[in-house]
Structure formats: structure tokens, C-alpha cells
Regions:
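N-terminal beta1-alpha1-beta2 submodule of the flavodoxin-like/Rossmannoid cofactor-binding fold
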Residues: 3-4, 8-117
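Short, glycine-/small-residue-rich phosphate/pyrophosphate-handling segment
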Residues: 122-160
């Protein structure tokens, strides 16, 4: 009887989903927001998080759409390594820049070495999304490079 109760409780635990994105103008924010909403609709406990902006403030402010997006999403918390440890599943969303993830996303991923070394990335269920302003902009290469990192983590990659 106790085992039945425990297994029933386990079945009702919400999946902890971190949706981590970088977006200059808002496209990947919209993708991430939709993924977070879908997770919530399915009963997941969701954290919608952005990675730290590393472009100089003067550059961000010199591009009206970039500045407007930064201001509109100022309320979104920045992702930390602790969010990766917390999550059961992670969806990354980043623009494609010349066939690779943005430097902002890579900078965040590069901070995760200490939690990887402790085994905190093993068996995380992960996926990724990307966008580019042009056809054949390197989206596939971006996703594959992100997945290479995640394979190295020991994560379980779920492709679209």
C-alpha cells in the first residue's frame, strides 16, 4: 500500500522546465514564451529565463528595436547555473549568428562547467530552437552545435 501511494505521488510531481533564451529583437523571446506556456498548460513548473546581455549598452541603445526589446523584457530573470541544476528539462532558444549560437548564449553555457563537473547536467532532458533572418542562415548548424555540448553533458537530447 505504501509503495502504491509513493508511486502515485511520484506520478503527480510536476516536471521542472527551464526555458532559457537569448533574443535581440524578440523572435526567440516569442519562441521561448510559447514553449513556456505550452509547458505550463501540460502541468510543468516553468521558469522562463533569459541569458545575460553581453553587448555593450551603447550598442543596444543604438538600435531602436534592440533597445525596445531589452526594455520590454527587463522583468524576465537572468538564467543562472542553479536554474540548470533545478530543472528536469531545459529548452534553449537562441538566434543563429553565422551558423552558431549567439555569443551571449555561449557565454552562459560556458559558465556551466562547475555543475557539469559535479554531474548536474547528466540525464537532463534538453532541446533547442533557433531562428535566423534569412533562409539557409545556419539554423541546422546552430542546433547541432548546441546538441554537441548537451551530448557532452550527458543530457538526453530531444530533437524537434
Amino acid at each position: 500500500m505504501i509503495m502504491h501511494i509513493i508511486s502515485m505521488e511520484v506520478l503527480h510531481l510536476a516536471v521542472k522546465l527551464a526555458v532559457i533564451y537569448y533574443s535581440s529583437y524578440g523572435t526567440n523571446y516569442q519562441l521561448a514564451k510559447k514553449a513556456a506556456e505550452a509547458g505550463e498548460q501540460l502541468g510543468a513548473e516553468v521558469r522562463l529565463l533569459k541569458v545575460k546581455e553581453t553587448a555593450p549598452q551603447s550598442v543596444v541603445e543604438s538600435v531602436p528595436a534592440w533597445k525596445a526589446h531589452a526594455e520590454a523584457t527587463a522583468h524576465i530573470p537572468e538564467a543562472t547555473p542553479d536554474d540548470i541544476v533545478w530543472a528536469d528539462a531545459i529548452i534553449f532558444s537562441t538566434p543563429t549568428r553565422f551558423g552558431v549560437a549567439t555569443s551571449q548564449m555561449r557565454a552562459f553555457i560556458d559558465t556551466l562547467g562547475p555543475i557539469w563537473a559535479k554531474g548536474h547536467t547528466v540525464n537532463k532532458v534538453v532541446s533547442a530552437m533557433t531562428s535566423a533572418q534569412n533562409p539557409h542562415g545556419g539554423q541546422e548548424a546552430t542546433i547541432l552545435s548546441l546538441y554537441t555540448t548537451m551530448y557532452h553533458w550527458g543530457a538526453i537530447v530531444v530533437t524537434p
